[in-house]
C-alpha cells in the first residue's frame, strides 16, 4: 500500500469515526480497529503486532474524538456530569485491566474476540432498531447508585482497553437501564468514553514501550502518523454527528450500521483467524 493510499483511508475512517461518535455515542473503534488492521497488514507490519497496534492507535485517536464529541454534547446540555463523575473511578480501573489483558493475548486471539464482539453488537443494534429506543427507561427498576455506576464503569473501561473501543456500545444500553433518555445516554457515553480512552491509551503505551519490530513512527503500540490524521479529521466530524443525532432517525442508522458491522466481523474472521 502506498503512503497516499493509507492517508486517504485514514481520512475516511476519521470522518466515519467522528460522525459515529457524535451521532450514536460510539467512540468509532468498531470502524477504526478493523480498518487499521487492514492497513497495517498491507504495510508489511509483523502479524504478531497488527491487532495490538490497531487497538493502541484506535484508543489514542478516540481521546481526541471523544473530547470534541463531549464538548458538542455539553453544548446541547446532554451530558449529566454528576453521572460521569460516579462512572469515572470504575472506568479507570477497567481501562488499566483491559489494556493489561490485551497485551497478554496474541493477534489471532484478539481478532477472534473483536470479531465476536462486533457480531454481538450488530445483533444488539439490529434488535434495538426495531424497538422503542427509550423503552428501558420506562420499565427498568435499576437504580442510579454509586456502586452500580462504578461496576458499570469497570465493564466499560475493561472493554475499551481490551479492544480499543470507546465503550459506547455498552454505556448507552446500560444508561438506558438507569432510565436515562437516549440522547442523554449518548452524551454521557461520549464523556465517559473520553476517560476510558485516555487512561486506556496511557496504560497501553506503558505496557508496550520497548516492543521490538514496530514500524517507524510508533510510540509503543501507537502509530503516530495514523493518530494525527484520524484524530484531526474525526475531531472535525464529531460535532457534525452531534447535530445530526437530533435530526436523523436513530433507528434507521442503527439498522444500517448493524449490517455493516456484521460484514466487517466476517471479513476479520476470514482474513486473520481462519
Question: What feature does the model see in each segment?
Answer:
Residues 18, 55-62, 189-197, 261:
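Transmembrane helix-bundle signature of multi-pass membrane transporters/permeases
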Residues 1-24, 31-52, 66-158, 176-184, ...:
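Juxtamembrane transmembrane-helix boundary motif
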Residues 170, 174-195:
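Small-residue-rich alpha-helical segments with characteristic i,i+4
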Residues 28, 198-203:
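Hydrophobic alpha-helical transmembrane segments that constitute the membrane-spanning cores
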